Amino acid sequence: MENSTTTISREELEELQEAFNKIDIDNSGYVSDYELQDLFKEASLPLPGYKVREIVEKILVVADNNKDGKISFEEFVSLMQELKSKDISKTFRKIINKREGITAIGGTSSISSEGTQHSYSEEEKVAFVNWINKALENDADCSHLLPMNPNDGSLFKSLADGILLCKMINLSEPDTIDERAINKKKLTPFTVSENLNLALNSASAIGCTVVNIGAQDLKEGKPHLVLGLLWQIIKVGLFADIEISRNEALIALLKDGEDLEELMKLSPEELLLRWVNYHLTNAGWRTINNFSQDIKDSKAYFHLLNQIAPKGDRDDGPAVAIDLSGFNEKNDLKRAGFMLQEADKLGCRQFVTPADVVSGNPKLNLAFVANLFNTYPCLHKPDNNDIDLNLLEGESKEERTFRNWMNSLGVNPYINHLYSDLADALVIFQLYEMIRVPVNWSQVNKPPYPALGGNMKKIENCNYAVELGKNEAKFSLVGIAGQDLNEGNATLTLALVWQLMRRYTLKVLSDLGEGEKVTDDIIIKWVNQTLKSANKSTSISSFKDKSISTSLPVLDLIDAIAPNAVRQEMIKREHLTDEDKLNNAKYAISVARKIGARIYALPDDLVEVKPKMVMTVFACLMGKGLNRLK
């Protein structure tokens, strides 16, 4: 290690030793690559997942002196010096603590050596198993897999054929996967891989980060990866309606003097917290600030249940009486048990055990509260004529596609609202790095922003983002200023975001073609040549070609790239109604994902022949075709 790196004082050394001991959950005297990566995730660094992995990979080369995949304390100190010298470790504070209910298993990845430890949460596994058992209990396609036993490893085996994952994705975001594309009978290793590809690429399309998960990981049932993916899928479903344009009653959560625009910027987690506090205030109880420390005694939950339970005076069914006698129980665990008995009366006992409440498990308590909200929101839209309801227009399909694309790449923070969450351009910079546009991070203002002048800091970021787009990325950004991004000007923001997505899509292609620049014409030419050489009668003249509305050129191209992937009896070829076209498109998108194409476009994009999204579909398929040739 070079001498120019930061020196570490004795005090810091002692702190590092203490930190190392906390990370080293199995007291083996070293931490593994996986534990390091988790540590980064826990630290509040404004870095996307892919960046964290890059840092870990690069630093392991430097710090892991004896190349055994394990980091000793001495190596850890030199690693910290490296990080400090790169000014990355300012917020390197949160350390993974050893917790009860953590199951450690031997490392199985090719990077990790024998003896490395991957840990997963037993509580999460139990919660997810119970949730899936209930959600899919009546699905005949899953009868050979359900119910799973929450007390053993059957979850990891049951997910291995991909069927359950596909079903859970459709529960969270209906119609994401065309059921006709799922292989259900007489499964072979190949058809199982297809199912897992379909699940992964569909999860990606609904905004789950899957950059470090492969079909093989799911087939092998690697617990930490399986649980991580499952949580993301479940969360998409739980949060789907915690959004003001989908649920106008949330306007009741407006505070005095607050603009609707401000409320609309809140994340689902923040809205849930505000919803709980709305009911706690009505109950005359103190408010909470989190779903961990503040709910451990179950008392807030008792009041919440009492507030939202049907009183029999509205359309939400017969009255349910909440018994508050358990509120005064002295023992926390018993009190939590009594509280959950009351939640059970509302059919909402899912996700937490009494121990999960008392330990303050933030993930599972968040899920518990989201499920309560979805079942009994107990909110009434105020008769307030001052509110501009035009603001409540939901996001367009195009906006949602862009948002899901960004989130699937692991950007940080997660994008809940396309415009307000891009207002400081941090995510734009991360996307620039992914398309190899260098970002000078020392020029970027990072959160938390000051109360006074904070927006100016965000505008400075946006100015830099536009400057990079024009000068480095060579994007066409005529008439776009930093302020437009900051204010969330839809047309101008979308113009930049589309060019980012286009460049990202084409970068994947040019990487396959040894760096050759790829243009629309090259893609169209390749599509037509591939169709012709497979003796297909379809072709396209441009990405606006009306024949694309039938999806037949897409389906024929898939068949040319991956023979037998398309079942011809599923396709309607003549006298197509609008419904036929949509059915073809749904099938085409799902089969494309099944053969491994990471497609973000929606069936409607094909039916309506949206040239931008059509381009991404053909580009992804070209990537798949070139990959197969290699």
UniProtKB/Swiss-Prot annotation:
Tissue spec: In the inner ear, it is expressed in the organ of Corti. Abundant in the utricle (at protein level).
Residue sites binding Ca(2+) 1 per the record: D24, D26, S28, Y30, E35
EF-hand domain mapped to chain residues: 11-46, 51-86
Record keywords: Acetylation, Actin-binding, Calcium, Cell projection, Cytoplasm, Metal-binding, Phosphoprotein, Repeat
Post-translational modification note: Phosphorylated.
SUPFAM superfamilies registered for this protein in UniProt: Calponin-homology domain, CH-domain (SSF47576), EF-hand (SSF47473)
Domain Calponin-homology (CH), first and last residues per copy: 122-238, 266-377, 396-505, 517-626
GO cellular component: brush border; cytoplasm; cytosol; plasma membrane; stereocilium; terminal web
Entry keyword annotation includes Cytoplasm: yes
Phenotype upon loss of function: Knockout animals have a progressive form of hearing loss at all frequencies. Hearing loss is moderate in young adult mice, progresses to severe deafness with age, and is associated with defects in stereocilia morphology. Stereocilia are shorter and narrower than those of wild-type mice.
Domain of life: Eukaryota
Xref: InterPro entries: Actinin_actin-bd_CS, CH_dom, CH_dom_sf, EF-hand-dom_pair, EF_Hand_1_Ca_BS, EF_hand_dom, Fimbrin/Plastin
Modified residues (N-acetylmethionine): M1
Compartment annotation: Cytoplasm; Cell projection, Stereocilium
Main location: cytoplasm
Pfam families found in the cross-reference section: CH (PF00307), EF-hand_7 (PF13499)
Gene Ontology BP annotations: actin filament bundle assembly; auditory receptor cell stereocilium organization; intestinal D-glucose absorption; positive regulation of multicellular organism growth; positive regulation of protein localization to plasma membrane; regulation of microvillus length; terminal web assembly; vestibular receptor cell stereocilium organization
Single GO MF descriptor: actin filament binding
Actin-binding 2: annotated segments: 382-626
Function: Actin-bundling protein. In the inner ear, it is required for stereocilia formation. Mediates liquid packing of actin filaments that is necessary for stereocilia to grow to their proper dimensions.
Quaternary organization: Monomer.
Protein name per Swiss-Prot or TrEMBL: Plastin-1
Protein source organism: Mus musculus
Phylogenetic lineage: Eukaryota, Metazoa, Chordata, Craniata, Vertebrata
